[in-house]
Amino acid sequence: MLLLLAEYLQQFHKGFAVFQYLSLRGILGVLTALSLALWLGPWMIRTLQIRQIGQAVRNDGPQSHLSKSGTPTMGGALILSAIAVSTLLWADLSNRYVWVVLIVTLAFGAIGWVDDYRKVIEKNSRGLPSRWKYFWQSVFGLAAAVFLYKTAPTSVETTLILPFIKDVTIPLGVGFVVLTYFVIVGSSNAVNLTDGLDGLAIMPTVMVGGALGIFCYLSGNVKFAEYLLIPYVPGSGELIVFCGALIGAGLGFLWFNTYPAQVFMGDVGALALGAALGTIAVIVRQEIVLFIMGGIFVVETLSVVIQVASFKLTGKRVFRMAPIHHHFELKGWPEPRVIVRFWIITVILVLIGLATLKLR
């Protein structure tokens, strides 16, 4: 939006041409979203408290979590609002990738909003039935996958890239739709499962989102892409503005979500942010790198799958409780220790993911 204004004002002063630089608009995206989140955060928390929109805590979880009952939830709406406003202000709105990621993010946020709303109204932690949640996730995930497949100008945008391996790619064809569906929906649910402790999900999301922003910037520049042997995806560089907005909004939210949390993001935030990461990774052809950098999300998801499968097959549980962050809590780890150690692991995994740019 402001990019169009800057383009118009260039005829009066050439200095406005500076807004053509992606790096500047990415930074402005961070600062705008961060400012909005910090400014609106206290108001949103008060509003949630007045409306008694509080978190319902399961009785079968860690006993230390019972004190969290009633903490304002649905704070993810703050994150999404800051991301949307910042992106609309600083991104090139003629870029199709910007709209794909923004629409997918808001669509999954809407699913999470309904889920959270039902939890608040019914005063339980179950929310929207799983079958309906997965149904609507599948609808939006498949819609995004089909759109990206149908509008891909070259086969490069539907080819699987293997990190660490030079000149080896796998043409997916229609299989691209299937892979994209699983990446978007899987990432959405993985972040949601991770969002069980104060600040546990948002900081890894910010770190992975920032790293994906680097991939977007490099993939959208033909010279960088050729030098680093990564796919050149014209227009993908514009997503650095969205990634910047995600970083700013996430850090602003963390200000209120850090232990002990004043507000939880709820499914409205977790489902949306996970879907956003998955969609961006698909666009820049870095699905496997997302799997590496988001290792915490992957482990959290696998712990649930293993726990359920083990109990159904043998009647025994592998972990004291799943997702795995609760397992460590029940082993006696204080909540802040679990959170920070998971953050440290994410830093390491993100660095490994970024290393794939050169190690080929």
From Swiss-Prot:
GO biological process: cell division; cell wall organization; peptidoglycan biosynthetic process; regulation of cell shape
A Pfam cross-reference name: MraY_sig1
Catalytic reaction(s) noted: UDP-N-acetyl-alpha-D-muramoyl-L-alanyl-gamma-D-glutamyl-meso-2,6-diaminopimeloyl-D-alanyl-D-alanine + di-trans,octa-cis-undecaprenyl phosphate = di-trans,octa-cis-undecaprenyl diphospho-N-acetyl-alpha-D-muramoyl-L-alanyl-D-glutamyl-meso-2,6-diaminopimeloyl-D-alanyl-D-alanine + UMP
Species annotation: Pseudomonas putida (strain ATCC 47054 / DSM 6125 / CFBP 8728 / NCIMB 11950 / KT2440)
Record's function text: Catalyzes the initial step of the lipid cycle reactions in the biosynthesis of the cell wall peptidoglycan: transfers peptidoglycan precursor phospho-MurNAc-pentapeptide from UDP-MurNAc-pentapeptide onto the lipid carrier undecaprenyl phosphate, yielding undecaprenyl-pyrophosphoryl-MurNAc-pentapeptide, known as lipid I.
Transmembrane segments: 25-45, 73-93, 97-117, 134-154, 168-188, 199-219, 236-256, 263-283, 288-308, 338-358
Subcellular location(s) per record: Cell inner membrane
Protein's pathway: Cell wall biogenesis; peptidoglycan biosynthesis
Gene: mraY
Family of the protein in this entry: Belongs to the glycosyltransferase 4 family. MraY subfamily.
Keyword entries, A-Z: Cell cycle, Cell division, Cell inner membrane, Cell membrane, Cell shape, Cell wall biogenesis/degradation, Magnesium, Membrane, Metal-binding, Peptidoglycan synthesis, Transferase, Transmembrane, Transmembrane helix
Membrane topology: Multi-pass membrane protein
Taxonomic lineage: Bacteria, Pseudomonadati, Pseudomonadota, Gammaproteobacteria, Pseudomonadales
EC code: 2.7.8.13
Cofactor(s) essential for the protein: Mg(2+)
Annotated disulfide bonds: none
Keyword Transferase tagged: yes
GO cellular component: plasma membrane
MF term (GO), any: UDP-N-acetylmuramoyl-L-alanyl-D-glutamyl-meso-2,6-diaminopimelyl-D-alanyl-D-alanine:undecaprenyl-phosphate transferase activity
Transcription regulation is among the record's keywords: no
InterPro entries: Glycosyl_transferase_4, PNAcMuramoyl-5peptid_Trfase, PNAcMuramoyl-5peptid_Trfase_CS
Superkingdom assignment: Bacteria
Protein name, as recorded: Phospho-N-acetylmuramoyl-pentapeptide-transferase
